[in-house]
Amino acid sequence: MTSDPLLLTKENFALAEFEAEEIYPRIFVVHDFVRPAEIEKLELQFSTMNEEDWRVSYTESLYRFIEDQYGVRTFEEAQALGHRIELDGEWVDKNAIIQDTSLMQTLNERLAKIFAGLPGVELRGVGSIQRQYEGVRLNYHIDSESNPRVLYACVLYVNGDFEGGELHFPRIDVKIKPAAGDLIIFPSADDYLHGVLPVEAGPTRYALPAFVDKRED
């Protein structure tokens, strides 16, 4: 097995007892990674949330991100340390913290198995639900531009019955329309600039993002 932490291969999935499809070099899909019963628990949470719940949860998720990344709790403290923090007004109602901590732990332990054989990496696991309703898109970006430690992005899909909302890699001309329960993993590199196309009328798109970082020794 390679000692290069960037080179995730199908062997890593096999050792973790997952069957992965490599749909493009270094883009992997694992079907049914999130189990039906787990999907039901997640659906129960966001089905009971109102718009104010989403807004409050988004703000709390930002505070957690700042604390995790910079070791401080407020925007002012992070900015005083020289970090640039920007609030995206379009996303204030689109992220919610996963309330079922047991489920969150189960998903992260399962995900960590895939990367267990790679030295020098650490999982920044799922912790929030991301939603995109009609007209909402995720702009093109490379995750390591905001955090240079990011090696891989992981996206777990709660549903796949939405229209539009494809994961799009414009530089390699790849579009992915996931199914419920799918896990998609891809590297944070220039060729893998990516975004999510606008969701059309109908069901909302729900996904759980996670990242794999280069460990700071």
What positions do the PLM features span?
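Non-heme Fe(II)/2-oxoglutarate
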Residues: 2-118
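Beta-strand elements of modular eukaryotic interaction domains
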Residues: 18-19, 119, 143-145, 197-199
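A short catalytic or substrate-binding loop motif that flags glycine-/basic-rich loops and adjacent residues
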Residues: 22, 121, 132, 146-150
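Short beta-strand segments enriched in hydrophobic/aromatic residues
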Residues: 34, 46, 158, 212-214
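A short coil-to-beta-strand element that immediately follows conserved catalytic motifs
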Residues: 118-128
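Conserved short histidine dyad/triad with adjacent acidic residue
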Residues: 130-146
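Catalytic core of Fe(II)/2-oxoglutarate
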Residues: 145-146, 150, 161-217
